[in-house]
Regions:
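N-terminal [4Fe-4S]-dependent radical SAM core
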Residues: 78-85, 105-153
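Canonical Radical SAM [4Fe-4S] cluster-binding loop centered on the CxxxCxxC motif
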Residues: 148-183, 280
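Conserved non-cysteine loop/helix-boundary elements of the Radical SAM core domain that shape
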Residues: 171-348
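A short, structured N-terminal alpha-helical element that caps or precedes a catalytic domain
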Residues: 1-87, 101-102
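Short beta-strand motif preference
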Residues: 41, 52, 155, 267-269
Length: 348
């Protein structure tokens, strides 16, 4: 089966494509603009069936109002044809909690939000309530930040033990750059010293050391960076200090002890998957057992705020394997879990 989308204007193509894709995720879809088309949006199925949002169906209004009407009409017609509904309705390309947060800050009451969200975006009641709940949690955290004088510090370590096959980050394999790592660390410490000086009148709220894989550095190099941060930055207003410990094959007890000694409050151990065949495919040089061992080692050293990262949609993985990964990680009981979805980009 194939689906061809014809839109009368470029402005309608993005939402039309993603709404159709949500109903038919496994189907090949093409998107076309025909300015003289008789309908705002027309969906042509390979079996000859056609769904159209006709111009006569849409009331006059602003461009945004017309787009919203078109999206709703398209959704309802696709829902009738497929017999399905989408939990997040017509939402595409926006975080639901961003919309909920805006209404929360405007003073909207919970039930009024649920009604507005469902009517505006055709979201299910369950998801509307979830968006409101998460926005409330986020607001409690964000209200602790000082938006006038506060700031956050990010320290990037652009090295990894190896580069995973899916990765497009600006990082390189440690073996290829080993002769430059010490020089990078020293240059980084100079930059940290400078930034500590120019921001000393500000309030440091959070520190995040990421990458790359920060623990691809040896213990001495990690110690140098963490000591430099201790020297040049005040912790008086610090709410969170994270080191992305990263891959189990780069984490050692010595490195964790260095991190712990500098009073880092949160680490992230990132398996990405608990499927051994996938780890092998993506170029990870460690086992599922290594993940569990490293996690337990961190717990034994007193780390009480451990995040774990997963990626949905890794090459060859099924929904059942993702479910198995979530169950295995759940048994470890990390303090937080971050799930990314793999975005396959084409290179022209």
């Amino acid at each position: 089966m194939m689906i061809k989308i014809i839109c009368s204007a470029q402005a309608y193509t993005y939402n039309a494509y993603h709404i159709v894709k949500a109903f038919y995720p496994a189907v090949e879809i093409t998107n076309h603009v025909e300015e003289k088309a008789s309908n705002y949006v027309e969906i042509n199925f390979s079996d000859g069936q056609v769904i159209a949002v006709e111009k006569e169906e849409i009331k006059a209004g602003t461009d945004a109002e017309k787009k919203a009407q078109i999206d709703k009409k398209l959704y309802k017609k696709l829902s009738e044809k497929s017999g399905k509904t989408l939990a997040w309705g017509i939402l595409t390309g926006v975080r639901p909690t961003k919309l909920a947060m805006k209404k929360l800050e405007e003073g909207m009451e919970p039930e009024a939000f649920v009604s507005w969200f469902r009517q505006t975006y055709l979201v299910s009641e369950e998801k509307a309530r979830l968006a409101w709940e998460i926005a409330g949690r986020e607001k409690k955290l964000l209200d602790r930040l000082d938006y006038e004088d506060g700031y956050s510090l990010y320290v990037g370590i652009p090295f990894c033990p190896t580069v995973c096959t899916y990765c497009s980050f600006s990082s390189g394999a440690l073996e290829d750059w080993k002769d430059f790592v010490d020089a990078y660390v020293e240059a980084l410490c100079k930059e940290l010293a400078f930034n500590g000086e120019v921001s000393k009148e500000k309030k440091l709220n959070s520190i995040y050391i990421g990458g790359g894989t920060p623990t691809s550095l040896n213990a001495r190099q990690l110690e140098r960076i963490l000591s430099c941060i201790d020297t040049h930055f005040s912790r008086e207003y610090l709410l969170e200090y994270t080191v992305e410990a990263g891959r189990p094959d780069s984490i050692t007890e010595e490195k964790l002890q260095v991190i712990k000694a500098h009073k880092v409050t949160r680490i992230s151990i990132n398996p990405q998957t608990m499927q051994q065949k996938t780890l092998d495919v993506i170029g990870r040089k460690h086992t599922v057992e290594d993940i569990c061992r490293t996690y337990e080692m961190a717990r034994s050293l007193g780390f009480d705020n451990i995040n774990m990262d997963l990626i949905a949609g890794l090459p060859g993985e099924t929904a059942l394997e993702m479910k198995d990964t979530l169950e295995k990680v759940g048994r470890l009981q990390p303090d937080s879990l971050t799930v990314h979805s793999l975005d396959r980009k084409s290179v022209v």
